[in-house]
From Swiss-Prot:
Function: Thiol protease that recognizes and hydrolyzes a peptide bond at the C-terminal glycine of either ubiquitin or NEDD8. Essential for parasite blood stage survival.
Keyword ATP-binding in record: no
EC number(s) from the headed UniProt entry: 3.4.19.12
Organism whose genome encodes this protein: Plasmodium falciparum (isolate 3D7)
Name by which UniProt lists this protein: Ubiquitin carboxyl-terminal hydrolase UCHL3
Catalysed reactions, as listed in the record: Thiol-dependent hydrolysis of ester, thioester, amide, peptide and isopeptide bonds formed by the C-terminal Gly of ubiquitin (a 76-residue protein attached to proteins as an intracellular targeting signal)
Effect of substituting residue 13 to D: Small increase in deubiquitinating and deneddylating activities. Small reduction in deubiquitinating and deneddylating activities
Domain of life (superkingdom): Eukaryota
């Protein structure tokens, strides 16, 4: 469970995240590992890709790059983007999933009366900040998070986590980066369904991986429809 309101971080594990999603109330999506961002490796990923979840090491180069991007997004209209602020340390994995679910609800319905269904109904008209505060009080999500979180040998290790989850989604023909530490979403570029994965891969390569050449603690997951469900 949480220690001093600090959660134990999730792992970038497709099977674990799928089981976590099912218990939360979204069984129509699944996750597959992305092993690299050259076209040959991306060609192996089943289409259509709905989103990309990305885990990366936090460092000054990336923070500086992202701060620059943020300034370019101040005039964007984000009324059509579901967003939540992160206030709980190490909750970024769950925040990324909430961003995923919130922006794909029109295509992949949540299980009725599930934990997610109840949460989204409650926070639907709230600001991103109030949604983040509401998550702090949601014991159902917290308990499920810790049912599927990573294992740590020393509980004090959860204080020193320096990796972070974000998610990339396509909304109205644009690639949107959703990061709960930021004040608003980040718009990167125009794309389309066929090119979304490849365009997102280039963003990740240029704006994240190239900034951390000495630290290879990266992990990426493609989000695709579960074989048992059709897209609405």
């Amino acid at each position: 469970m949480a220690k001093n309101d600090i959660w134990t971080p999730l792992e970038s594990n497709p099977d674990s995240l799928y089981l976590y999603s099912c218990k939360l109330g979204q069984s129509k999506l699944k996750f597959v590992d992305i092993y690299g961002f050259n076209n040959d490796l991306l060609d192996m990923i089943p289409q259509p890709v709905q989103a990309v979840i990305f885990l990366y090491p936090v460092n000054d180069n990336i923070v500086s790059e992202n701060n620059t991007n943020d300034k370019h997004n101040l005039k964007e209209n984000f009324d059509n983007v579901w967003f939540i602020k992160q206030y709980i340390p190490n909750s970024c994995g769950t925040i990324a999933l909430l961003h995923l679910y919130g922006n794909l609800r029109n295509k992949f319905e949540l299980d009725k009366d599930s934990v997610l269904d109840d949460f989204f109904n409650k926070v639907n008209e709230m600001s991103a900040e109030k949604r983040g505060q509401e998550l702090k009080n949601n014991k159902s999500i917290e308990n499920l998070h810790h049912e599927f979180c990573g294992q740590v040998e020393n509980r004090d290790d959860i204080l020193d986590v320096d990796t972070h989850f974000i998610v990339f989604v396509q909304i109205e023909g644009k690639i949107i980066e959703l990061d709960g530490r930021k004040d608003h979403p980040t718009v990167h570029c125009f794309t389309n369904g066929d090119n979304f994965l490849y365009d997102t891969g280039k963003i990740i390569q240029d704006k994240f991986i190239e900034k951390c050449k000495d630290d290879l603690r990266f992990s990426a997951l493609a989000v695709i429809p579960n074989d048992n469900f059709d897209i609405i």
